[in-house]
Amino acid sequence: MSNHTHHLKFKTLKRAWKASKYFIVGLSCLYKFNLKSLVQTALTTLAMITLTSLVITAIIYISVGNAKAKPTSKPTIQQTQQPQNHTSPFFTEHNYKSTHTSIQGTTLPQLPNTDTTRETTYSHSINETQDRKTKSQSTLPATRKPPINPSGSNPPENHQDHNNSQTLPHVPCSTCEGNPACSSLCQIGPERASSRAPTITLKKTPKPKTTKKPTKTTIHRKTSPEAKPQPKNNTAAPQQGILSSPEHHTNQPTTQIQQHTSI
């Protein structure tokens, strides 16, 4: 509809332009015949018609340009919005079926049942242990003597080997006929077995702790031979005798020193 209307408008513009041409030719003929008043009126009307026609044509061209620009912008918007609203057209039902069949064709083979594998391995291990017990009981060496250890103590390095030699007795390889368990036992010969007896550790009784009693320290002081014990001051003795005697005068400071030390 829009194209049809634009086509009609374009035809009307052509007709108006042709009519204006004819009108201009007529005005020029009148001007030659010296009809100035008629020419002036005709020119004014022609100017009004041309102005209106130019305005109409400008409006039509602007509308046509907008109409042509809109279809070009719409596909770009649809292309940008199409992946957001719809799924990709490449992933159809046919593609889905083909990929599903290819996945089924490339699946791994089914694994064996775990219960059956466990039963077979368990029965095989039981048979091996029974064969090992019967052969070890029937083929034990009779002349084997227990090892003697004169020292009575083993280092910690060989203690683990001694325990292993006790749990795995020696079996001669001549009795093994296609049995892998027996062949692994016969490789452990009597040379590898340790020749030391098991260690016997004696617990040491703890000694009773003796607590020492604190001893009294006596301090002996040396006394001069001249110093003698003085009797108590007698009230009856006169003081002149004390002052007059030179021995008492010399021994008095020594006795005072002893009294200070004893205090």
From Swiss-Prot:
One GO term (biological process):
symbiont entry into host cell
Looking at the UniProt record, the site noted as Cleavage sits at: G65, N66
Q: Where is this region: Disordered?
A: 70-166, 192-263
Return the GO cellular component terms, semicolon-separated: extracellular region; host cell plasma membrane; membrane; virion membrane
Topology: which residues are Cytoplasmic? 1-37
- Glycosylation sites per record: T72, T80, N85, T87, T92, N127, T139, N163, T199, T215, N233
Which ranges are annotated Basic residues under compositional bias?
204-222
- Give the top-rank taxon of the lineage listed in the UniProt record for this protein: Viruses
Ranges for the region named Binding to host heparan sulfate are 187-198
The answer to keyword Secreted applying to this record is yes
The residues that cross the membrane are 38-66
Pfam families named in the record: Glycoprotein_G (PF00802)
The reply on keyword Disulfide bond is yes
Q: Where is the composition biased (Polar residues)?
A: 73-90, 98-128, 150-166, 231-243, 251-263
Q: Which residues lie on this side of the membrane: Extracellular?
A: 67-263
Signal sequence, start to end: none
Q: Which cysteines are joined by disulfide bonds?
A: C173-C186, C176-C182
Keywords of this entry? Disulfide bond, Glycoprotein, Host cell membrane, Host membrane, Host-virus interaction, Membrane, Secreted, Transmembrane, Transmembrane helix, Viral attachment to host cell, Viral immunoevasion, Virion, Virus entry into host cell
Family statement: Belongs to the pneumoviruses glycoprotein G family.
Q: What is this protein called?
A: Major surface glycoprotein G
Taxonomic lineage:
Viruses, Riboviria, Orthornavirae, Negarnaviricota, Haploviricotina
